[in-house]
Amino acid sequence: MLDILREPDDIRIECEADNVDCTVITEIRDERLYVYVTAAASRPRFICLRWNTRFTEPTRIMGDKWERSYGDMEWHSLNGEIFMPWYFLANSADTTVGCGVMTGAGSFVSFQCDASGCTAWFDVRCGGVGVRLDGRRLLAGIVVCCRYEGISAFEAARRFCRVMCERPRLPEKPVYGSNNWYYAYGKSSRPEVIRDAALTAALAGENENRPFTVIDDGWSVNPCAGPWKPNERFGDMAEIAAEYKKLGVRPGIWIRPLHDVVLEKEHPAWCLSRINDGDQNSTPTRCLDPTVPEVREYISATIRKMTAWGYELIKHDYTTYDLFGAFGCALNGKITIKDGWSFHDETKTSAEIVSELYRLIREAAGEAIIIACNAVSHLSAGIFEVYRTGDDTSSRHWSRTRAYGVNTLAFRLCQNDAFYKIDADCVGLLPGKISWSLNRQWLVLLAESGSPLFISVHPEALNEEIKAALTQAFSRNAVQTDAAEPLDWLYNNQPQAWLVNGQKREYDFVEEYYPALLSGSTQNY
């Protein structure tokens, strides 16, 4: 079976021009392989490490993602064209091997496995060009490799995630509650979010650990685009937070920290040199460059403003898309598709810049809980308490919830409590849309997964049966002591057989709702 905790058989260096002085040093100590890169004149782009080995037994492979997953996680055959960010697992019979890098790496690291061995690519670029190290010694990543025998592949994945992250930042109390996006989709108002808070408080009953009610996109003057000031439908956001607390919920709020259309027009020099092209649902946009000192001050002040308003949870979104110009589903190996652009500070790698941004947000938020959405997973671990692991579920299209929700819960639940608390996204309830039979199963599985449960409920979708089920789910999830494990995930990427607290559970996530053709858009809710 594969073992990469040894000196690589080959090392290759790709620089912006001819390699003049870039060197790579690997050191093995304490059962880890340290990868260092040094250059004075050369500007390295990629470092390639290769371990040659023949796979002699039938082997299945499962890797992680740069940011969220998009219904695309699964165990697959050896395929050298699939590049797996951060880590992967190889399973053969009762043996599972985990290969990856420690969280907080200094570069974007991806792996590939083929029949003749394994390759690790260290993307040390600054944006789309080689980084200017100026003689600095960069720790590009720390490689780890563990072999597990006699335990399930899921348990092996869970243990390996704990190896990769030594100090996760976890909330003092379990996080759960409601979010208005999945029924309002950005069209909301102060009276409606107050109603949401009252409903959430009622569903939580006498739970000592009170739920959050998160105001998602739609509260600011320009939806999804800043500046982060309330529109006339919401008014004073501090008053809303205070009302939430009176009702018995903890206030949460959504923000896109790297996009402010007013600031970008006033200070074009503060923007990234690259314009995001957008997709069929979004227009091309400029975004702020977090290596510009004034931008860092702006981001910090914006986050501090929200905590001063009284919000105890901040959900930040779009940092991967805004920084690199694509959603994770469009990326394979390289974190950014476009070449020829860089951040204002060319002396740091993209990974270092992302980590600095996340630490800035963390520091500005103080004691507030952070949910990171469309964020870089391996660079969020140890900094943020909660991490959205999959693209949006839906209150309208069950195929989307099944593909994006069930899949990400199964394949990233191993990260729960190891990197952060995983957020597999909401149970969305709209009248006349997804059948309660299906949504009920999704609700129960989430509530008993040991990971955060969020619901998004239009009041007209409720009846007494649904209210009772939501109350029971909140009661269960308020403590999050359950343990769940997918049993059929080696051959089913939307697992229906689960082990919950040692008891086997069978779900039917299809019923009469056969998989439908999705539009291909990441925003088709």
Regions found by a protein language model. Name each.
Residues G186-K187, P223, S456-H458:
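Short helix/loop capping segments that flank catalytic or ligand/cofactor-binding pockets
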Residues E74-H76, Y87, N209-L429, I466:
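Aromatic- and carboxylate-enriched substrate-binding clefts and catalytic-loop regions
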Residues V37-A41, Y87-A93, A197-A204, Y244-K245, ...:
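Hydrophobic, Leu/Ile/Phe/Ala-enriched alpha-helical segments that form helix-helix packing faces
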Residues M1-P211, L313:
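Carbohydrate-recognition beta-sandwich/jelly-roll modules
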Residues W181-Y183, G218, G432:
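Short strand-loop junctions, especially beta-strand C-caps/beta-turns
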Residues D123-R125, D134-A140, N179, E346-Y525:
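Active-site-proximal substrate-binding groove within the catalytic cores of carbohydrate-active enzymes
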Residues S189-L203, P293-T307, N439-R440:
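Short, acidic/polar
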Residues L199, E206, S220, D260, ...:
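Glycine-rich, acidic and aromatic/proline-enriched surface loops and short helix-turn segments
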